[in-house]
Structures are given as structure tokens and as C-alpha cells.
Amino acid sequence: MAASTAAGKQRIPKVAKVKNKAPAEVQITAEQLLREAKERELELLPPPPQQKITDEEELNDYKLRKRKTFEDNIRKNRTVISNWIKYAQWEESLKEIQRARSIYERALDVDYRNITLWLKYAEMEMKNRQVNHARNIWDRAITTLPRVNQFWYKYTYMEEMLGNVAGARQVFERWMEWQPEEQAWHSYINFELRYKEVERARTIYERFVLVHPAVKNWIKYARFEEKHAYFAHARKVYERAVEFFGDEHMDEHLYVAFAKFEENQKEFERVRVIYKYALDRISKQEAQELFKNYTIFEKKFGDRRGIEDIIVSKRRFQYEEEVKANPHNYDAWFDYLRLVESDAEADTVREVYERAIANVPPIQEKRHWKRYIYLWVNYALYEELEAKDPERTRQVYQASLELIPHKKFTFAKMWLYYAQFEIRQKNLPFARRALGTSIGKCPKNKLFKGYIELELQLREFDRCRKLYEKFLEFGPENCTSWIKFAELETILGDIERARAIYELAISQPRLDMPEVLWKSYIDFEIEQEETERTRNLYRQLLQRTQHVKVWISFAQFELSSGKEGSVAKCRQIYEEANKTMRNCEEKEERLMLLESWRSFEDEFGTVSDKERVDKLMPEKVKKRRKVQADDGSDAGWEEYYDYIFPEDAANQPNLKLLAMAKLWKKQQQEREAAEQDPDKDIDESESSSF
């Protein structure tokens, strides 16, 4: 008992007795201390030796040491969550999911309010496809921290991505019980609308406007009903909003939106009553926008019809004068048609359109037709969207296509717009017939692409193949088409067919972007893990071009293959490239190759390999050359930089002479310096001759 008591007491250190209290002979200042500390900071510590793990025992030892390090860091400061996350991510990188899970759980015990910790934990489970574990984590997170919106968003997004619509809806319902901010409600509504659940979205809006009873939210609710053509419901929403806010909290924006809705429904008397009711109860200072919109409405439909008629008639007369003076002023026709569409009857609008399209450009050049063709586009869109007359829309498209001189030029947009219209009318054969006619009359890249895109959306892959074949017959130099065709076959799983397409493509005598095609072919073979085929492709490409980027890419491919001897093969490629490019006129490309080689040796080579490449690096020298003007006269001299490679210098006598001249100049400078210094032996300068 006495021993334990004595051990438990703290030992008090003995006070050192100072024998000599006189000041030291050499005093150390604070400045000296700081200088020494700074000098020690500049000392470079050697990097720790790289450890290469060769067997399981060493791996286990490495894991044990790393875990001990992480545990020590955590023990020092448990509240630093980044240490926990790094520890868990390290365990995850080793596929030790259970250990990572345990670490996250321990971290949550330390700080369960840390948002990042929950997110990293759940993301780990999702990344490893542990869906149920991820669900449990999200469930715990939203239960523990229900006011963190990020948890709810990610939880619902995960459920939706998994196709669990009912589960996502259940999560949203739990979220709404907490009455979150407005954006959360909008997310729920948009979720339901993505699955065409209009009735559910309406129910959510009903709850939303009660939780967040702002004017803008009531307006959004009404516009939602209007957008889905529930006009009676939209009117009821506006009426409920007016009743909800009453006379004490009236807002002009609500009444403006209500009036515009009724205006769109052509209920002009209702519009007038709404404006008058609001203006009678809202002060003029707060009703500027309301009064402005009422004035515009009255100019359109109300008692001020005479004023409106004068304004419209004046503008119409102005446009008539402009189009009479220059019938081919298509901008004036556009303005005129915009005015007529906003005010006149459908027959009047059609009459003006017919007058406008009658002014065909006199010259059959595409640049003169670009503005004119949009008259036909707008005419067709008006008939389809405003007049709701599909038959007349079809006639407009057909008339425009008959008018265009397809032998000289065409407008792919007109063919595509027509085909899209027929698809909207569910006349797929008509759309195909139109596009087939277009590529028969006037084949064009945009037409082929549009037709192929249509058939792809319809999953008609055989038709896509035929279209690609015709496309490539029309433009065999188009590399993009070859690549897209091969990618289609790859997606369909026909690898041999895709390879045959690539072989046909690279055998073409003329290509617009051959480098893109070759890269795509090489990437395709790499994806198929055909190492030998890829190597042969690089060899074929190097027979056609000796570009430095091809050599570098070839070397990097050999290095990335991961097979035994890949480093040696990569080095062999660099050596072969260096030998090949000795006669290359572009010295910058040769320098680029050597720099890439040096980077490779820095990472994988030995000291001798690095020194060998360093010896091949060129010297940068400044030179002068004559410059000639465009007329052939002498324009003086210009300086430029050139590169002298050691291999070239050894084979050129003039470069040897230049090196000797530099040495002689250096010796001359040393002799002059020696003559100026009397303490130096003057006889040393006599050795300057060569």
C-alpha cells in the first residue's frame, strides 16, 4: 500500500545549483539564434527510401504500421474528422470495407453532427454497390440531422437512380413532414412530374402553398395548372389566393398574373374586373406595374380601341411602305408578320405570309436565300402551333421544298423540320420518305446525320447501317462518319464488323482528319485488349508518318500495357524513334521526343540510363539569317534559336571548329585577366594557342 502511494506521487525535479553566476565570455544574441534556425531549415533532408512489397508478410507488416500511424493520429486528436476519413478511405482502397465501416462508425460516435462524415460514409457504400447499407446510413443521417437538406437530396437521388420510385416518394414524404425550404418542395414536384404524376404534383402544391404561403408560390401553382391545360383549376387557384391574402396583404403581382391568365383564355371582361378590383384597393405607389399592364390591356381590347387601331394602322402602313419600296427586305416582312400575328385574324396572317413568300430571291445563291427561307419556317410553325392546322402545315413544307433549287444548293433544316413535323403527327413513313428524298436529291452531311439520328432513336439499327453505307459512299473522306459507324457496331457488340470498318477507313486515299481516325482505331483495339493488333497499328501508322507524337504515344502504350518487359519495350521505342528522327528537319520535334524520353527515364530508369539521355540533349544556340521581303529584296538579318545535338556535332567538322573557337576565346579572356592581376603567373597565358 505504501509502495503504491509513493509511486502515485509526482516527483518534483531537483533544482540545479549554479556554481558560476558570472556572464559568459561569448554572448549569444537572439539574432544569432534566429539565423541558425533559418539555416537549419534550408538543409535538405534525404527522402525516405522507397519500400517495395514482395510478399504477403511484408504487406501485412505495412498494413500494421499504417494502421498504427492512423490510430496514433486519432488518439492524439479525436476531434479532427479528416484523420478518421483518411483512415477509412485507406481501408477502402484495400477493399477492407468492413474495417472502413467500423472506422466510420467510431468517427460518428465522436462527432455525429459532422455532415462530411455522413456523406463520405454513404458514398463509400454506394461506390461499393452496398445499396442496403447506403439506405441505412441515409436513414440514420436524416433521422439524426433532419435539417440538413443535402442528405435528403442525395437519398432521394439514389433511390431514383436505382429505379425505386416508390422509395424515393416515401423519402420525399418524410422530408415534407419537416416543412423544409421552398426548393425542397419544388424538387418533390419536379420528381412527380418526371413520372407524369400530375395529380400527385397537385396534391403537393396544395400542401406547399399552405406551408410557404408566398405570392410567388401561389402563382407557380396556378401556372402549373395552366401548363397542364387545367384552366378551371388554375382559375380556382388564383381565386383562392386572392381570398387567402384578402385586402390587408394585397400584392400587385398576384393580380397581374391572374389578369394575364384570363387574357390568355380570352376572358376579357374578367380581366377588366380583376384590374379594376385591384386598382381600387392598392395604393398607386404600389400598383405601378398593375396600372402599366392595365393600360396595355385596354389598348389591346378595351375602350381605347380607337387609340390602338391608330397605332397599329400607323405601324402597318409603315411596314407596307417598306415592303413596297423593297419587296426583298425580309427583315421588314418579319416585323410586319410579328405585328399581324399578335393582332389579326388567321386569314389575315396567312394573306401576309403568302405575299411575303412570293418574293423569291432573284439570284440562286444560298447567301441570298438564308433570310428568305425563314419566312417559310415561320409560316409552317404558325400553321402548326397557332392555327393548329396540320394539313396546311404539310402543304407549306412541301411547297417550300419544291421551290428550293436543290441542284445548286439546299437547306437541310427544311428537310429535317418537315420530317420532325411528320413524326409529331405520327406519320413515320412520310418522315422517312422525306429524308430519303433529301439524300437522293441533294446529299449533305447534316441530312445524313439527322436521318441516322432519327433511326437510332427508333432503334432501327439495320437502317442505320444502310444509311452509314450511303453516307460513306457520298463522303468517304469524312473521318467522323467512319468513327461513328464503327462505334455503332461496337455498341451493338459486333467487334469484327467494327474492326473491318476501321480497316476500310484507314485504307481510304484521302481523309479530312486521319489523325483522329487512327487514334479512334487504336483506342478501339486498346479497349478490346488486343495488344498485338494495337502494336501493328502503330507500326502501320509510323510507315505513313514519322510524327513525334506518334512515337511518344507508341512508347506510352508499351509502358501502359503492364506486361513483363514493358519498360524495356518502351525504351526500345524511344531509341528507335531517336535514330529515325536524326534526319528530321524539325529539331523541336526531336527535342520533344528526348524530353519525353528523359521523363520516362526519370521515373523508371537507372542513373546510367538518365545520364545516357542527358548526353543526347541538344545545346540551344543563337544564330542569324538573312530575311527576304515579299518582292525578293534583302530585308536585313534576324536572330533565331537553333539546337545542336551531340550526335550531329560529332559528325560535322564545322561544329568541331566552332567548339575550338569557343575554347580559344575563353583562354584569351583568362590571359587578359591574368595580365591585369600582377600576383598571377603571366606564363600561364602562353598555352592559349590550339
Swiss-Prot record:
Q: Name one GO biological process term.
A: mRNA splicing, via spliceosome
The source's domain of life comes to Eukaryota
Q: InterPro entries per the record?
A: HAT, HAT_Syf1_CNRKL1_C, Syf1-like, TPR-like_helical_dom_sf
Keywords in UniProt for this one?
A: mRNA processing, mRNA splicing, Nucleus, Phosphoprotein, Repeat, Spliceosome
Q: Where in the cell is it found?
A: Nucleus; Nucleus speckle
Comp. bias intervals (Basic and acidic residues):
667-679
GO cellular component term of the entry, any = spliceosomal complex
Care to name a GO molecular-function term for this sequence? Answer: RNA binding
Where it mainly occurs, coarsely classed, is: nucleus
Segments of this protein annotated with the region Mediates interaction with HSP90: 250-467
Positions with biased composition (Acidic residues): 680-690
HAT repeat windows:
61-93, 95-127, 129-161, 163-194, 196-227, 229-264, 266-300, 310-342, 344-378, 388-424, 459-491, 493-527, 529-560, 565-606, 608-646, 648-673
Phosphoserine modifications at: S342, S689
| Sequence motif: Nuclear localization signal, positions | 618-626
Membrane spanning residue stretches = none
Region Disordered, residue ranges = 667-690
User: What's a Pfam family this protein contains?
Assistant: HAT_Syf1_CNRKL1_C
Q: Which family does it belong to?
A: Belongs to the crooked-neck family.
Q: How does it assemble?
A: Identified in the spliceosome C complex. Present in a spliceosome complex assembled in vitro containing CRNKL1, HPRP8BP and SNRPB2. Component of the minor spliceosome, which splices U12-type introns. Interacts with PPIL2 (via the PPIase cyclophilin-type domain); they may form a trimeric complex with HSP90.
What the protein does?
A: Involved in pre-mRNA splicing process. As a component of the minor spliceosome, involved in the splicing of U12-type introns in pre-mRNAs.
Report what the protein is called. Answer: Crooked neck-like protein 1
Q: Which organism is it from?
A: Rattus norvegicus (Rat)
Q: What is the lineage of its organism?
A: Eukaryota, Metazoa, Chordata, Craniata, Vertebrata
Supply the gene name: Crnkl1
